[in-house]
Design a protein with these regions (language model features):
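Leucine-biased recognition of intrinsically disordered, low-complexity hydrophobic segments
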Residues: 1-4
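N-terminal glycine-rich cofactor-binding segment that shapes the pocket for flavin-like pterin cofactors
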Residues: 15-428
Length: 428
């Protein structure tokens, strides 16, 4: 694996990232969390008069956001993605379509290059599912982005969970949860061989006098033959600044955490409480140690939504204003897709019990076990997830928010946060 790399660094940052992670004076890492769609994880808030997410298809929207985040010293922009539609609610995608619940959604890859052009330090975390593209062409995409961003790109590795996505690439049903991670393990082995092993250092000569650009003796076919992939050839790209981009992993099931312990440099989780987050962080670090890694070589980010005002009262008023725009139907469409549970079959006051599904098992566990004393109803769940998704919400003045984020770091050992928005770009 490549060494730990800090997204925001403008110089080689391996030592600095490790130093910060291990020091007593910890730096809180902040990523903005967005998606190439309307509203992302705040269904209905696209109708708010100050929201710009409906402009997602305009390049100016993304360039403005990149400049804002660079000015605000964010470490990176974490770009989510989904290839499929949320069609579990009432067995139809109609609710998602009506409420613009992550549909329409454009490809995230094309956003990165123009945003990199107007920034110097901002990192970019690209979500790309390894379920829908062969590793050979995808390795070329990663190298290309790493070249064009001068080493500021990361890859959020997801295995995909929507049945609709599987059906639209010719599969009758989604592959079993754990089998997808077995597939992912081999996928990563192919990626490593292509990015790290195919081209030696010094293979690119650019020798004008001898008219030799690259030395074929230093470029090697990977000759991979495995259960899922056969890749005999060389990587098509010369080595990029990082070779392998920063690797994110965003699943918190037991198998997902095992995968993260072996591969990830950064892990994205969505724990709604400090108790659950502390347990999750400790589990990930324990698994990393068992895999022979320094437990703190993995940076762990929790989903968080912040609503800030000049005073606590102003922030609370802003939150109350935002809640008027939340779409209950859109929230249920998200929740149904995330968990595989059709919440349309329940009344709003229906109390839910723990349910095992094949879709985002960690999300099901989160709302079922986060607060054992709370009776979770469909309405309560929709209210909770309606602004920012499954993560906790922090509302208050700048001082209140800073103190609260610091307390999460100190009490849970988390390294930072992926900050979702209620209204964009206002939230950021």
């Amino acid at each position: 694996l490549p060494s730990l790399i800090h997204f925001a660094a403008c110089a080689p940052a391996t030592g600095r990232a490790m130093e910060i992670a291990m020091s007593s004076q910890r730096e809180i890492r902040l990523n903005a969390f967005d998606m190439n769609c309307v509203g992302h994880q705040s269904p209905g808030l696209w109708a708010h008069p100050r929201d710009r997410s409906w402009q997602y298809k305009d390049l100016e929207y993304w360039v403005d956001l990149a400049r804002l985040l660079e000015r605000g010293k964010f470490d990176g922009l974490f770009i989510a993605d989904v290839l499929g539609i949320y069609d579990v609610l009432n067995g139809s995608g109609d609710a998602a379509i009506r409420q613009a619940t992550q549909v329409p959604v454009n490809d995230p890859l094309a956003l990165i290059t123009p945003m990199a052009l107007v920034t110097e330090h901002l990192g970019f975390g690209l979500t790309a599912s390894l379920s829908f593209e062969h590793p050979y062409p995808f390795a070329r995409r990663l190298s290309t982005l790493d070249h064009l961003t001068k080493g500021r790109v990361g890859w959020n590795i997801v295995t995909s969970y929507l049945e609709s996505g599987a059906r639209n690439i010719g599969q009758q049903t989604q592959t079993d949860h754990d089998t997808r991670y077995d597939y992912a393990d081999e996928y990563l082995q192919v990626i490593y061989k292509l990015l790290e092993g195919s081209w030696e250092d010094g293979a690119v000569l650019r020798d004008r006098e001898r008219r030799i650009f690259s030395d074929p003796r230093k470029i090697h076919p990977i000759n991979h033959q495995g259960q899922f992939f056969s890749v005999p050839g060389i990587h098509l790209c010369e080595p990029s600044p990082q070779r392998t981009p920063v690797l994110y992993q965003a699943g918190a099931s037991s198998r997902g955490k095992q995968f993260a312990a072996g591969h990830a440099e950064c892990v994205f989780v969505a724990a709604p409480s400090k108790v659950l987050l502390k347990k999750t962080v400790a589990d990930i670090r324990r698994r990393a140690a068992e895999a022979g890694r320094d437990p703190h070589s993995i940076l762990i980010f929790n989903l968080q939504t912040v609503i800030v005002g000049d005073t606590d009262r102003e922030a609370q008023a802003k939150w109350q204003e935002y809640k008027q725009y939340v779409s209950y139907e859109g929230a249920l469409a998200l929740l149904s897709g995330w968990t595989g549970i059709d919440f349309g079959q329940y009344q709003p006051d229906q109390v839910l019990k723990y349910l095992h599904t094949n879709a985002i098992q960690s999300a099901v566990e989160a709302f079922s076990t986060a607060d054992p004393n709370r009776q979770w109803t469909v309405q309560a769940l929709a209210d909770w997830a309606g602004i920012g998704g499954f993560g906790p919400l922090v509302v208050g003045s700048a001082q209140t928010v800073a103190d609260e984020l610091q307390s999460w770091v100190e009490e849970t050992d988390v390294d930072g946060f992926n900050l979702a928005y209620a209204v964009t770009h206002e939230t950021f």
